[in-house]
Amino acid sequence: MERLDKVLAATGRWSRREVKLLVKQGQVRVNGVAASSAEEKLDPETAAVTVGGQAVVLQKHTYIMLHKPAGVLSATEDNRQKTVLELLPPELRRRGLSPVGRLDKDTEGLLLLTDDGELAHRLLSPKYHVDKRYYAEVDGLLGPADADAFAKGMTLDDGLVCLPAGLELCGSGACIVTLQEGKFHQVKRMLAFRGAPVRYLKRLAMGPLTLDPSLETGAFRDLTAAEVSALRKTAGL
């Protein structure tokens, strides 16, 4: 059993002082009942806690789904350009979050931010066969021969060796690419190699985690307990 203020402060969203104020204001409920004290004891593994009517995921690590906009770097800091961490409030930036994999500056879509280093490593390692799915709009025509080339794996003109990947044609000038690796500019390089340079790219999913369609560009939310569990299962944890 742990104190309520300690558990909520560990999420990185509030300080203990802020938790005490929220409890005093009647904003915090534990298992449906208004908390009477910030020192109240609870089991973070089983307790259902809400703050201001919003469910709070109580867990050791922080997991954030971000709908990355174009024009922002997938980095923790940069002296000249805006990074994805700058899209988060200060209390989350203090959590030591890092992006799981990098989306190019001009690429949009799903980006997982976490302080769970072991999970991040496994999601990115080809050893664990975690699919990353992208939607691309291209200049040029793609056909069954290109899908076959993706399925067999390919070596690009610059020497990059690409593992077998999925290419689903979505009508004129659009496709879905599924990879289990994430080398530098890989989707763009593979499609350009097949004569279809990318003009728009968006990541849709990583393993079982799919971009929430209700998240506007630049918005974020906590992963649900079910989403975290599914990711960890996929990564063999």
Predicted regions and their residues:
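Basic, flexible Lys/Arg- and Gly-enriched helix-loop patches that mediate nucleic-acid binding at interfaces
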Residues: 1-237
